[in-house]
Structures are given as structure tokens and as C-alpha cells.
């Protein structure tokens, strides 16, 4: 019985530092990007659409001021889209971006809140790009 107890103790002593090391290496989410307001009152930013990710993935904007986003896809084959939908209907943006292309969109958020940004493209029967992690958020203050 002591043999099994000793093995369990040794195993635990090895597992704790290993799991602590793994937790320390976990990627941290990028900090929010506060979109600056230009002299003309427009909030402008560029968002990179890559393989199943947006960068930046968390945008912070001001309510009532126009937002101009330049969406640049850096993928060579896979098309993406950029969707923001408020279930209450105060904000609805949906823009396709072909592989390797750049598109500029403009919208004015009127309601403060946090809204999901996502790509719903998918190749049947595979999971959607959102399911693979291509999502972010728009925070309107």
C-alpha cells in the first residue's frame, strides 16, 4: 500500500509544476483597441481578417460618431465576412471580404453596449469560421 501512496505523491508533485507551467504559457487576449476619432469626427481603424481571426478583435468606439473600418483579408484562398448584429436592431453590419481583398465600411452605432463581431462563412459540412474562433467584439461607449 505504501508503494502506491508513494507513486501517487510523486505523480502529484510532477503534475502540479507541469500544469502550472502550461497555465503560464496560455495566450492572453489582446487588449481592446480604442478607435481614435479623427479631426473630421470619424472613428477610423483597420481590421485584418486572417485564418479564423480578426486583429484587433476587440474594438472600442463612441456612440453617435461614424465608424469607418478598413477590412483587409490576408488569406489567399478563404473568403471571410464581418458581421455585427444587435438583437435589438440598433446595429446591423454584414460585409463579405474576398481572399486577398480590402473593403471599407462605414456605420454609426447609436446604442451603447457590447456587440459580437463574427464570420459565419463555412464550407459544408465543416464548422463555421466563428466556430473555429473567428469572432471578436465591438464595445460602444
Predicted feature locations:
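Histidine- and aromatic-enriched segments that form or immediately flank copper-ligand environments
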Residues: 72-99, 125-134
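Short beta-strand/loop motifs in extracellular/secreted proteins, especially
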Residues: 67, 78-82, 113
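Intrinsic-disorder/low-complexity, polar/charged segments enriched in Ser/Thr/Lys/Arg/Asp/Glu/Gln
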Residues: 42-46, 64-68, 102-104, 114, ...
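Non-cytosolic beta-sheet module surface loops
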Residues: 49-51, 71-75, 109
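N-terminal edge beta-strand
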Residues: 35-66
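Beta-strand-rich interaction surfaces with strong enrichment in secreted/lumenal proteins
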Residues: 56-59, 91-97, 105-106
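Extracellular/periplasmic metallocenter environments
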Residues: 27-34, 97-141
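Extracytoplasmic entry segments of secretory-pathway proteins
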Residues: 1-46
Amino acid at each position: 500500500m505504501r508503494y502506491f501512496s508513494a507513486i501517487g505523491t510523486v505523480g502529484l508533485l510532477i503534475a502540479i509544476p507541469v500544469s502550472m507551467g502550461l497555465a503560464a504559457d496560455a495566450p492572453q487576449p489582446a487588449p481592446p483597441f480604442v478607435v481614435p476619432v479623427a479631426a473630421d469626427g470619424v472613428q477610423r481603424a483597420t481590421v485584418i481578417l486572417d485564418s479564423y481571426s480578426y486583429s484587433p478583435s476587440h474594438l472600442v468606439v463612441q456612440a453617435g460618431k461614424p465608424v469607418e473600418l478598413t477590412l483587409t483579408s490576408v488569406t489567399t484562398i478563404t473568403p471571410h465576412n464581418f458581421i455585427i448584429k444587435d438583437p435589438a436592431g440598433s446595429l446591423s453590419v454584414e460585409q463579405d471580404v474576398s481572399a486577398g481583398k480590402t473593403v471599407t465600411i462605414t456605420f454609426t452605432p447609436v446604442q451603447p453596449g457590447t456587440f459580437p463581431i463574427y464570420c459565419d462563412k463555412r464550407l459544408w459540412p465543416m464548422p463555421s469560421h466563428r466556430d473555429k474562433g473567428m469572432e471578436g467584439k465591438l464595445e460602444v461607449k
